[in-house]
């Protein structure tokens, strides 16, 4: 919304991001009057609502000049990052399923209509395709390995700098020498709470079963296995 406003002067938003505001109704695709009243704001103070991918306008002349682009360049609405990722891999029809592992591990399934879980285990988002929805759950993914690298992989980071390579390559090479199952070392990667199978913001990460025989490579592999199997 902010970038589009800076580029075009228009104040607009779209459903997949508005889902996170708590004042947009995913069923009616309108602002939620009850919540607006509670917050003490009016619809006039909020962005107009568009569908994802809908053209908003052309670049403002001063922005086009700064970016070196034609002032006729059309700016369109985007979508939530995981929505864009799912559409990018072809997840565009109800019944399809995709998974993305980056900083987070996200699972997305396209739905014709929102199906709400009374237990709150599966968030539902508006999708980047009109009148389509997404069941979307996520947990910590690559950020767990980054945490390990930053806190326990200083040696690997130094070696990687000398060899002009990525420290993750070195961590991966070391982990590959450990047998599947990490010799009994098990990890739960809930370093920022858990979303599934039950939403639990108080969930914590766990290393279980480690002994004197386990090495740094075992811990690196246990993290990779945890992310892969979750």
Predicted regions and their residues:
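A glycine-/small-polar-enriched, mobile loop at the entrance of the PLP active site in fold-type I
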Residues: 18-24, 44-52, 134
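Active-site core segments that coordinate phosphate-bearing ligands/cofactors
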Residues: 1-13, 22-33, 37-38, 55, ...
């Amino acid at each position: 919304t902010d970038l589009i406003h800076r580029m075009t002067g228009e104040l607009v938003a779209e459903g997949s991001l508005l889902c996170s505001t708590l004042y947009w109704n995913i069923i009616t695709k309108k602002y939620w009057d009850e919540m607006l009243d509670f917050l003490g704001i009016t619809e006039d103070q909020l962005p107009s609502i568009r569908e994802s991918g809908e053209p908003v306008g052309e670049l403002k002349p001063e922005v086009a000049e700064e970016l070196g682009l034609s002032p006729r360049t059309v700016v369109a609405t985007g979508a939530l990052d995981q929505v864009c990722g799912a559409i990018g891999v072809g997840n565009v029809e109800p019944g399809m399923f995709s998974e993305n592992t980056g900083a987070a591990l996200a699972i997305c399934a396209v739905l014709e209509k929102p199906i709400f879980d009374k237990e709150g285990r599966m968030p539902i988002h508006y999708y980047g395709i009109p009148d389509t929805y997404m069941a979307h759950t996520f947990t910590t993914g690559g950020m767990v390995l980054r945490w390990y690298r930053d806190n326990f992989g200083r040696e690997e980071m130094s070696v990687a700098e000398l060899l002009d390579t990525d420290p993750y390559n070195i961590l991966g090479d070391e982990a590959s020498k450990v047998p599947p199952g990490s010799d009994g070392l098990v990890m739960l990667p809930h370093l920022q709470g858990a979303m599934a199978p039950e939403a639990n913001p108080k969930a914590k990460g766990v290393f279980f079963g480690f002994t004197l025989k386990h090495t740094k490579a075992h811990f690196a592999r246990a993290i990779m296995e945890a992310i892969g199997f979750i």
